[in-house]
Swiss-Prot record:
Top-rank lineage group of the source organism: Bacteria
Record protein name field: Phosphoglucosamine mutase
E.C. code: 5.4.2.10
Modified how: Activated by phosphorylation.
Organism for this UniProt entry: Streptococcus pyogenes serotype M1
GO cellular component: cytosol
One of the GO BP terms on file: carbohydrate metabolic process
Catalytic residues of the enzyme: 101 (phosphoserine intermediate)
Upper classification of the organism: Bacteria, Bacillati, Bacillota, Bacilli, Lactobacillales
């Protein structure tokens, strides 16, 4: 991560940290870096979610892009994966999404996609950051016919919706409850599932600029759970603010998280011989029950650091086509180059339809182990070196010996805060509490700030 770019673009409180001035510079410098080798006039797609700050940042960003001669196609409100899809299929130079994903309305973010539809590589982000920190803006300043042009492109939404529908199957006879988080999915999910002939019930579909992710969406699925039970829906589907992740709800109202969704889709693909290298890519945070279910099914796994960008990097480098995170980011590389909540939802419904099984039946093959996570405040200088402290290393080894393979411990530093995260999974809540609390006590004693 750089000074401005985190693991998912540039984020901050809108108009305070992520200002119009910064958005203009990101448009100008980002557009230049991503299009400097183009032989024809570069084309860049720009979309946003439903936050009140979106139009302000969109206007500033577009002004920056136009100032370096770029032809901008304004998509309006669209899911993040829709930008990625359109960049690839319409052969654009780049795409930009204005969103802070599952964060509250006061935040916003800007993330770039290259002409291949993937998020930027570290070296591209560093090149943009170098221009942001340069003492003087020395980029070209074209005038007259050298300036960029702006094209409103509402048909981009229709093209993305049609693409989604082509990946699915007829859902006649199925009732689907949707929670579009008052976000980007609110302009598309209803139409897509109606086109697939599902009966639908929808909440979180009335964005007002301030209510994105507010008590709704993938991080707050409680209302969706109630809607599923009230309507007798076959499944519920909750997206986040920019619709790049999905959390599902089965017909009994129980949550089906990203681990279980990946397993269900992965098993289906594996049985059809369509799971590349018979492998699913996941992160260190995936539940032990997920790993055991994969082992039982004979499916391999590749494990990365936390963050969908690391999952995608591993998928690209090794030729895998399915990966994701417990949080609901699922990447199905056969269809798109980034996490796509609506695409994942369609594939999940397709598995249900083609197998004739309920979501609870499909999800029951993964027994989720109780999990507990404790954050301990430590000095930044120590969080990366915690495992070098003998007492900490010894207590972790002791707890792992006691687990005898029927549990899991993960101790890792936070990527953004002076915290050490202690996580454990075990068959019972009591065992999880014991393992986490025992390790956490030693960490606090040895290197904790509050000790």
């Amino acid at each position: 991560m750089g000074k401005y770019f985190g693991t998912d673009g540039v984020r901050g409180e809108a108009n305070v940290e992520l200002t119009p001035e910064l958005a203009f510079k990101l448009g100008r410098f980002g557009g230049y870096v991503l299009s400097q080798h183009e032989t024809e006039r570069p084309k860049v797609f720009v979309a946003r979610d439903t936050r009140i700050s979106g139009e302000m940042l969109e206007s500033a960003l577009i002004a920056g892009l136009l100032s370096v001669g770029i032809e901008v196609y304004k998509l309006g409100v669209l899911a993040t994966p829709g930008v990625s899809y359109l960049v690839r299929t319409e052969k654009a130079s780049a795409g930009v999404m204005i969103s802070a994903s599952h964060n509250p309305a006061l935040d916003n973010g800007i993330k770039f996609f290259g002409n291949d539809g993937f998020k930027l590589a570290d070296d591209q982000e560093l090149e943009i950051e170098a221009l942001l920190d340069a003492p003087e803006d020395t980029l070209p300043r074209p005038s007259a016919e050298g300036l960029g042009t702006l094209v409103d492109y509402p048909e981009g939404l229709r093209k993305y919706e049609k693409f989604l529908v082509t990946t699915g199957t007829d859902l006649s006879g199925m009732t689907v409850a949707l929670d579009t988080a008052n976000g980007a999915a609110s302009v598309s999910a209803r139409d897509v599932f109606l086109d697939l002939n599902a009966e639908i019930a929808v909440i979180g579909e009335k964005p007002n600029g301030l209510n994105i992710n507010d008590g709704v969406g993938s991080t707050r699925p409680e209302q969706l759970q109630e809607l599923v039970k009230e309507t007798g829906a076959d499944l519920g589907l909750a997206f986040d603010g920019d619709s790049d992740r999905l959390i599902a709800v089965d017909e009994t109202g129980e949550i089906v998280d990203g681990d279980r969704i990946m397993f269900i889709i992965g098993k289906y693909l594996s049985e059809k011989g369509l799971l590349a290298h018979n492998t699913i890519v996941t992160t260190v945070m995936s539940n032990l029950g997920f790993h055991k279910a994969l082992d039982k099914q004979g499916i391999n796994k590749a494990i990365t650091a936390v963050g969908d960008r690391y999952v995608v990097e591993e998928m690209r480098s090794s030729g895998y086509n399915l990966g994701g995170e417990q949080s609901g980011h699922v990447i199905i590389m056969d269809y798109n180059t980034t996490g796509d909540g609506q695409l994942t939802a369609i594939q999940l419904a397709k598995v249900m339809k083609e197998t004739g099984k309920s979501l609870s039946e499909l999800a029951a093959e993964v027994t989720i182990y109780p999990q507990k996570l404790v954050n301990i405040r430590v000095e930044n200088s120590m969080k990366e070196r915690a495992m070098e402290v003998p007492a900490i290393a010894n207590i972790i080894a002791k707890m792992e010996d006691e687990m005898a393979g029927n549990g899991r411990i993960l101790v890792r530093p936070s990527g953004t805060e002076p915290l050490l995260r202690v996580m454990a999974e075990a068959p019972t809540d009591a065992e999880v509490d014991y393992y986490v609390d025992t390790i956490a006590d030693v960490v606090r004693t040895e290197i904790g700030c509050d000790n």
